[in-house]
Amino acid sequence: MTQHPPGDDRTNRIVAVTLDEESIGRSGPDIEHERAIAIYDLVEENLFAPEGADGAGPFTLHLGITANRLMFDIRKEDGTPVVTHLLSLSPFRRIVKDYFMICDSYYNAIRTATPDKIEAIDMGRRGIHDEGSRTLQERLKGKVRVDFETSRRLFTLITVLHWKGEGQ
């Protein structure tokens, strides 16, 4: 049997993601498609290492919104709780609002706009997405180590949860 050191890529990763159904707002097919792709991509390739739990994974992640906070419920693959982190939604509000506005522009543009205009809108969309991803990495610092691509995929999922949580 091969031993892998703590912190190796086989253990510091997410193998399953669930979203709190009560936290998910109604969204159109474009957002639902983006959510499904983000979950698939996240599970396929990620770096996710809760502080103090190196080598304890792989992990499952349940995302939701509770008491107007973003909830990361992290468990071992067998369901044993590892840690739950609650993050303020405040740092994400403007970014998510801007992201949804530019996504609406993008989805409208792909139906009628020129390729140059679509590309310009998409560059703006990616820039806002990157900003949200960096903000998430900063908010998770000292709690969960994630790489930038993992943070990008998690930010996509946060956008799905965010608006429903606003009304709670």
UniProtKB/Swiss-Prot annotation:
Signal peptide: none
InterPro entries cross-referenced by the UniProt entry: UCP032146
One Pfam family this sequence matches: UPF0262
UniProt family annotation: Belongs to the UPF0262 family.
Protein name (Swiss-Prot/TrEMBL): UPF0262 protein BRADO6636
Organism: Bradyrhizobium sp. (strain ORS 278)
